[in-house]
Regions:
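Signature of alpha-helical transmembrane segments and their immediate interfacial
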Residues: 1-38, 432-434, 500-548, 588-589, ...
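Hydrophobic transmembrane alpha-helices and their membrane-interface caps
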Residues: 30-35, 347-414, 472, 865-954, ...
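Extracytoplasmic/periplasmic membrane-proximal domains and adjacent transmembrane bundles
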Residues: 10, 52, 123, 169-344, ...
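Solvent-exposed, membrane-proximal periplasmic/extracellular interface segments of envelope transport
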Residues: 5-7, 62-138, 196-217, 238, ...
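Transmembrane helices with small-residue packing motifs
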Residues: 16, 24-62, 106, 120-129, ...
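Helix-loop junctions and hydrophobic alpha-helical segments within the transmembrane domains
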Residues: 324, 331, 335, 410, ...
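Solvent-exposed, non-transmembrane alpha-helical starts
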Residues: 20, 59-66, 103-114, 143-147, ...
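Transmembrane alpha-helices and their membrane-interface boundaries in multi-pass membrane transporters
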Residues: 399-413, 434-454, 461-501, 618, ...
Length: 1021
């Protein structure tokens, strides 16, 4: 390499400038570290949009055919569409648009624009009376701060006034995003009529409505231009309260009636209730607060806490303000834990360096660590990468790898100093002999993480910073090793270094003995290694599989699913029973309850649920992880024993993309009745498996319908239409909006309906008296018949086919992926017996895992190509490239040996770690093979070149392996990183041993190198 540019030599000749660069790098790193955003988990894009449409009065079938199907059909034109899922109830359509998991996050805003445009194109084809469609393309917004407001002795309206006041005041907090209220109940003024009394008086309820609307109308009365002035004319008559309504005199049928004489007027809350919210069992109103995108959650959280403290101090006695969820607090604790683990890893790596290299050499390596970290922090700040679970874990993993280059440089300098060279000569030679093999090894290691970086799935987006941080750390570590480490080494290392004892120590002799045995008995060594590899492949079936582990947060989610015809009042009663059970539990810190809806998205991977009167969700915060486990078991047993007929599910929070119940099977087909029949058959089969928890359907039960068949000819003779009858029945049963009362910032609906005694029974309709246009009262049954029918209250569809999803939890410690594998023969057999057009598809954890792993598999060829290219650039030999690569799969032996005894599952993150192992293992192998080449060029015989190169590289290879594996100990105890850490520690240790034993044996076998006889040994140069 004479005549080529030597970066280390340049650094030594420009030391002042290099020291300046180091100082600037450290200074920038410190400032970047302080400015980095903090998060608990990396963000990823929820690639889902919700389209909601209402068509009051329509049946479920009409809504499905005229609204839902039209929207679904149009959405099929989207190129990036994965599937459409819809939920149709009478008069209500909800369509979920799911984009392909590989859709780029930056393309999603444009795709949502296209969705708006496509639906706008078909608005003219929708039936009259449609409300919407409305679009929610912010489905993934996270409301990290949630407060509960309770009022002791206050009405819900009074409490809401205070919450609205706080809501308005916190708008001044910097970085505030969306703010939503939870559980507020709208006030309503009810006009409760007696249908019998109105009929006896000959009063048509529609006349009452028209009179009230006319008086309460807000209509311009004009403006007078009086010379230089403009005078607005105003009329009175608008209602300001229920008292104004009571005093109204109505002229009906040429007579005057006081409204209070023909209707009971009361002010209350919407009935049936809207979704309810409670805190620790007390009715409450929630205030959910989201931060603006890209903000610093800790800075925002601090500002929000200060403002909330100021505001709550001014609230009257009786108003309680409670923290339900505090993302800033969670992030501070999580990042604090991750940062502690990072510093633990730094200390471990430093200890390894000092023990193995000695004080001076270890100090050179120690100085390189903060330089690399500082430059990585600068990169993170300018690329928008925050400090969170994945990026900090990546730094910990990188720590053990980034010291490799510095160790190799220092080792080579010491070797040359032992030979009597000056420190400058030693540093220059270190670059000449190791810089490019190190760079090749670094690039190969980075290539091992490429499947993570180019994985376009949501899981890949979640773990992307793992690739970005490690790749930059590795590249920066090479620059530090060849630019900064030589300068530091020249100032720290001793000028005279005594040569190491030629005789190796006990460990060295053991390694040498093992290496020589392997080389002399090469086929035995190769055979044993291959046998171990085959055994490890076979043993992989005994390793448990998972997608992402459960979160290590203390929250527990408890879902209650009542029969789908249940009212919100029945759901509330079930919640009352459960809250009575948990209220005195010593393991619970607090809990919040959502009745008629799921929890607001306070945590990004939350599997958010739709509003449904038969559904409730409790978010219970336990006092710790041990308490969480015990509490889950107790709740599962209590719900199973005491809540028969109510579907329940108890789970900790998830990590990664949301899944919900882990075991899911979708039964789909053309005919709803047949789909229901097959779903019940499949559920019966699944129920025989003892590992499955409670099985529920997302829909299944038909509901009662009271059908009124109107004899149209008779109705027309009476001057009545179907619309007249339907409106009257709606006003009697559910209540119809009459007008509105303006009350401060609120609009209070005035609703006319039948009195309680009449409204609550079906007989009311059968005995209903209809007032005709001429004022006579006619029984409904005179021109109509009333009968009961069964109707599907709701229908879920997927890709325009009715689809029932069977969902279940896992009862024991078995992993969902393994259970699905166990159930596969049963599902396949059942699927084969279904009629044409009907099928069962597997969803849940297995489906989401497949979506995440599919893109990885597609990128692996690119990873292998990059590795092969880098190796060929360095080795210039196809044979040596295959020799080096042959060691890479052997890391699987260590992976299996680490996972099976510890019972650690193989998850998505562990798979990424195994792929990364390939690059790490090849890195050591390429440096060893390059060293063999150098010894051969120096005049050693092929046998001695292999022996000497292995002996020479043994120490640095073992040191880097120790640093890489021991450095991951702090994250091995983490729920998220544990599987990856165990897999990589086991893989690195075993692969390192095989690099020093198997690779020499394979090398001499491949090149047919024989051990020379003693009298034929060449002199060592």
């Amino acid at each position: 390499m004479k005549g080529s540019f030597n970066l280390s030599d340049w650094a030594l000749k420009h030391q002042s400038f290099v020291w300046y660069l180091m100082f600037v790098a450290l200074l920038m790193g410190v400032f970047s570290y302080m400015n980095l955003g903090r998060e608990e988990d990396p963000s990823f894009t929820i690639k889902t949009m919700v389209i909601q449409t209402r068509w009051p009065g329509a049946t479920q079938e009409e809504t499905l055919k005229q609204v839902t199907d039209r929207i679904e059909k149009k959405l099929e034109e989207l190129d990036s569409l994965d599937y459409v899922k819809s939920y149709t109830r009478p008069g209500e359509s909800t369509v979920f648009v799911f984009l392909k998991d590989t859709t780029s996050a930056k393309d999603i805003p444009h795709i949502w624009y296209l969705v708006h445009k496509k639906i706008d194109d078909i608005r003219g084809s929708f039936p009259q009376g449609l409300q919407g469609p409305s679009f929610n393309d912010e489905f993934g917004d996270v409301f990290g701060s949630v407060y509960a407001f309770t009022g002791d002795g206050l009405s819900m309206r009074q409490l809401r006034d205070y919450v609205e006041q706080v809501r308005a005041e916190i708008r001044s907090v910097p970085g505030l995003g969306k703010v939503e209220m939870i559980g507020q109940q709208d006030e309503v003024i009810y006009l409760n009529f007696s249908t019998r009394k109105l009929a006896a008086l000959g009063i048509d309820q529609r006349q009452v409505v028209q009179s009230l609307q006319s008086q309460n109308a807000v209509t311009p009365a004009g403006v007078i231009e009086a010379g230089p002035e403009r005078i607005s004319v105003r009329t009175s008559g608008q209602f300001a309260s229920e008292k104004d309504l009571a005093d109204v005199n109505l002229r009906l049928n040429d007579r005057f009636y006081r409204l209070a004489d023909i209707a009971e007027i009361s002010r209350g809350y919407v009935d049936p209730a809207r979704p309810l919210f409670r805190f620790n069992g007390t009715p409450a109103i929630g205030l959910a607060i989201a931060m603006q995108k890209g903000g610093n959650i800790q800075a925002f959280g601090k500002a929000l806490h200060e403002r909330m403290d100021e505001l709550t101090a001014d609230l009257p006695v009786g108003v309680g303000v409670h923290k339900v969820s505090d993302q800033a607090e969670v992030v501070e604790e999580a990042v604090g834990g991750f940062t502690s683990a990072l510093f633990e890893a730094v200390i471990i790596v430093l200890v390894v360096s000092f023990i193995s290299l000695g004080m001076r050499a270890g100090l050179v390596v120690a100085c390189s660590i903060p330089l690399v970290l500082a430059l990585v922090f600068v990169f993170m700040e300018y690329s928008g990468i925050t400090m969170q679970r994945v990026s900090l874990g990546a730094l910990i993993i990188a720590l053990g790898l980034l010291v490799d280059d510095a160790m190799i440089t220092v080792e080579m300098m010491i070797t040359r100093l032992e030979k009597g060279e000056t420190k400058e000569q030693a540093a220059t030679y270190a670059y000449t002999s190791t810089a490019f093999p190190m760079l090749t090894g670094t690039l190969v290691t980075v290539a091992g993480f490429v499947p993570i970086g180019l994985n376009a799935s949501s899981a890949g987006e979640y773990t992307f910073t793992l690739f970005a941080v490690i790749a930059v750390a590795m590249l920066v570590s090479w620059v530090v090793a060849v630019l900064f480490a030589p300068v530091i080494g020249v100032h720290i290392l001793s000028a005279k270094v005594k040569p190491h004892d030629a005789e190796p120590g006990r460990i060295g002799r053991a390694f040498n003995g093992g290496m020589l045995w392997a080389m002399r008995n090469r086929w035995w060594a190769i055979g044993i290694t291959v046998a171990l590899f085959v055994a490890s492949v076979f043993s992989m079936q005994f390793v448990q599989n998972q997608f992402f582990p459960s979160s290590d947060r203390p929250e527990i989610l408890v879902d209650l699913n009542l029969p789908q015809n249940a009212s919100i009042n029945e759901t509330r009663k079930a919640v009352d029973r459960l809250e009575a059970i948990i209220k005195d539990d010593p393991d619970i810190a607090r809990w919040s309850t959502y009745i008629g809806q799921g929890a607001i998205r306070f945590y990004l991977p939350l599997d958010q649920q739709l509003e449904n009167p038969y559904y409730a969700q409790l978010v219970i915060v336990s006092k710790g992880l041990e308490e969480r486990s015990a509490l889950i078991q107790r709740l599962q047993k209590r719900l199973r024993d005491d809540f028969v007929g109510i579907g329940s599910y108890v789970q900790p929070l998830e990590m990664g993309p949301p899944v919900g119940r882990p075991i899911q099977y979708r039964v789909s087909g053309k005919d709803i009745d047949q789909v229901r029949k097959h779903a019940i058959e499949l559920a019966t089969l699944l129920d025989q498996n003892t590992h499955l928890g409670e099985i529920i359907y997302d829909w299944n039960e038909p509901g009662k319908v009271l059908r009124v068949d109107i004899a149209q000819d008779k109705a027309r003779q009476l001057g009545l239409s179907s619309e007249d009858v339907a409106q009257l029945m709606n006003s009697v049963v559910s209540g119809a909006s009459v007008t509105q009362v303006h009350d401060d910032i609120y609009l209070i609906n005035v609703v006319g309906r039948a009195e309680d005694a009449e409204r609550g029974t079906p007989e009311t309709l059968q005995n209903l008296q209809i007032v005709t246009p001429n004022g006579t009262s006619i029984p409904l049954l005179a021109f109509a018949t009333v009968r009961y029918e069964l109707e599907q209250p709701l229908v879920w569809r997927r890709d325009r086919k009715p689809t029932i999803t069977i969902k279940a939890s896992v009862r024991d410690e078995m992993q969902p992926t393994d259970l699905v594998k166990q159930l596969a023969p049963t599902i396949d057999k059942f699927n084969a017996g279904l009629p044409v057009g009907y099928k069962v598809a597997t969803g849940g954890t297995v489906e989401e895992s497949g979506k995440a792993q599919g893109p990885i598999a597609s990128v692996v060829p690119l990873m292998l190509f990059l590795m092969a290219t880098f190796l060929m650039i360095q080795l210039h030999s196809v044979q040596k490239m295959f020799l080096v690569a042959s060691v890479a799969p052997l890391g699987l032996i260590g992976v299996v040996l680490a996972l099976i005894p510890t019972g650690t599952p193989m998850g998505f993150v562990a798979i990424l770690g195994i792929l990364a192992l390939i690059g790490i293992i090849i890195r050591n192998s390429v440096i060893l093979v390059t060293q063999i080449d150098e010894y051969e060029v120096a005049g050693y015989s092929p046998w001695d070149a292999v022996v000497q190169a292995t002996e020479h590289r043994r120490r640095p290879i073992l040191l880097t392996a120790a640093a890489a594996s021991l450095g991951m100990i702090p994250i091995a105890r983490e729920v998220f990183w544990g599987p990856m850490a165990y897999a990589m520690i086991g893989g690195i240790i075993i692969a390192t041993l095989l690099t020093l034993l198997f690779l020499p044996a394979l090398y001499v076998a491949w090149y047919k190198i024989r051990e020379p006889k003693p009298d034929q040994q060449e002199k060592r140069g």
